[in-house]
Regions:
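A generic local structural motif
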Residues: 26-31, 50-52, 72, 98-99, ...
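Short hydrophobic helices that act as membrane-entry/anchoring signals
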Residues: 6-24, 77, 81-84
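Non-catalytic C-terminal accessory region of glycerolipid acyltransferases
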Residues: 1-8, 98-283
């Protein structure tokens, strides 16, 4: 099996990578963790459309990202196709996409995916977004509300934790309303005050992971390379950084739940390191 669109991918990686680095000036840590050959699955958190750029500019290898079919059928579909993306229909259990990905891995190529399965941002999730806005609709215009969500990068996983804490009466309704639009700061404060456990805090950092990455790694012998991006996709003072973690293998006899938890722990570790470096002014 020969990779398609290799020349187009290299051209766009060079062009897009140039402007990406020029505009965002990301700090990339431990890119040497990406093997130069053999089947690999790059597994990252998902906070922005440009998340895949970090991996793409960190290796000479072509990385085939799995992307929802709407991206490939939209006005920039040509770009996603030339970038080697695999079209995924999220409305069904897309066996064609899965088989294509497995085929690539079995031939020793590189796959990229986001094991959370979706972007972890409240402003882009209609159901969560509308429910949260009910708390503020009498005080904040909707456009301003969305602007605040984007500026503070309020994550769905953070709101999920706040919902649980409210239900368990670990926080009050007033605290929820006063802090939901800056959830990460509030959750960190709760941890410092020992009102929540470290495990609860960890739950706020990522959405629950899907089994796809560890399942494909087990079936093909591919190595999983975790990568986590923290900071903001803005022009100045963004503290944008991505760090690659320890490689993960999933032996044939390993329980997939155990493998998924292993991947999650490594991704959480990387995110904590990124947040710590930002807080300490290292990035």
């Amino acid at each position: 099996m020969k990779e398609e669109h290799v020349h187009g991918y290299r051209f766009f990686r060079t062009v897009v990578g140039f402007f990406y680095k020029l505009y965002y000036k990301p700090t990339i840590i431990n890119k040497e963790a990406i093997p130069k050959e053999g089947p690999i699955i790059i597994c990252g958190n998902h906070i922005h459309l440009f998340d895949q750029n970090t991996a793409c500019i960190s290796t000479d290898r072509m990385i085939h990202y799995m992307a929802k079919k709407e991206h490939l059928e939209g006005p920039f579909g040509w770009f996603f196709k030339l970038s080697g993306c695999i079209s995924v229909n999220r409305e069904i259990h897309d066996e064609n996409a899965k088989n294509h990905a497995l085929d690539l891995l079995n031939h020793g190529y590189a796959l990229g995916l986001f094991p959370e399965g979706t972007r972890n941002q409240v402003w882009g999730k209609e159901e969560v977004n509308k429910k949260l806005y009910e708390l503020y609709k009498n005080k904040i215009p909707y456009k301003k509300y969305i602007k605040i969500l984007k500026a503070n990068q309020v994550c769905v996983s953070e709101i999920m934790l706040l919902d649980i804490l409210l239900e368990q009466k670990k926080i009050t309704k007033e605290e929820y309303k006063d802090n939901a639009l800056n959830a990460s700061v509030f959750i960190e404060k709760l941890l410092e005050e020992k009102r929540i456990t470290e495990e609860e805090y960890d739950e706020s950092l990522l959405l629950p992971l899907k089994f796809g990455a560890v399942s494909m790694a087990q079936k093909t012998g591919a190595t999983i390379i975790p990568v986590i991006t923290t900071g903001k996709y803005v022009f100045k003072n963004n503290h944008l950084n991505s760090r690659f973690g320890n490689p993960i293998k999933v032996p044939a006899d390993m329980n997939l739940e155990e493998a998924k938890e292993l991947l999650r722990k490594e991704m959480v570790r990387l995110k904590k390191e990124g947040l710590k470096d930002i807080k300490e002014g290292k990035i």
